[in-house]
Amino acid sequence: AIAKLPMDEVSRMKRADEMGYNRDAYHGSTRDIREFNTVFGNREGHYGANHYFTNSVDDLGKNYAGEGPDLTQRITEKMERLGDEGIEPSRKAAKEALGIENKGVSYPVKLKLKNPVKTHGKDETFFDYQAKYDEDPSSDYYEEFLGEEGKFIDLIDDTKRVMRNWNVDDVDGVMAKLQDANMDMEGISASQFEDVMRNNIYDLYHPETGQMSSVGELIADVYKTMGYDGVEMGAYKAFGPQKRGGGRWGGEGYMTKGMEGLDQDTLHYIAFEPHQIRSKFAKFDPTKS
């Protein structure tokens, strides 16, 4: 007879850790989720139609467990689009189109992120760059340029390929902005890369579905192409209070309010594939990893 797996919490969490599901997180949804997919994913989300999680119960309660700011905006936009399509724009119709089935449920999960891009945090991913020269020992002035290497080169190559696949209007202009961001010739951070992309690409449509999409989904495609399996984001630095104004224009500027429910330790996780996500109450059967 096949021995049954012990189902006490200690045994399940031990198996979860051994299988790589070692990050505790929460997902807030107005859908009754049996398994994760992107059917009702928001292509205009910060990283497009991927899977979003937080490590903070406070963040979850304030922003994601019900009709928080993001979902309220999506409902309003959907109502406007229904009207454009000749359908009576009601909240009920918009909710049905968005797959909203309840008033908000919190899902505790275990995530398997082996190689996430880290952004807006203390140890964020850095795409390094090195220019290689062969110094002529007989000359104090002559150096032969041998080439370039580093993660920045991979980033540039993969970004160009993905942008062309997405039919971005000004690929060369965006590439020039990325090169400008590497002015010190040492490389750029993930947040610097994202700032350039988000500030210089507009009016995107998904190459497969034709749906309007966010620059974030293109960014996620770049990360996937480079071999990353998700994103770990310092949410407070990304979405907390931000300074506006001042700087070289003079004056003290001002601080925006930012999202509620965040603190310096709040992390947002974005998983690219459904198999990276398991309910905290799953069996964690090694034969079904």
Q: How would you label these PLM feature ranges?
A:
Residues A1-S289:
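Active-site and NAD+-binding cores of ADP-ribose-processing enzymes
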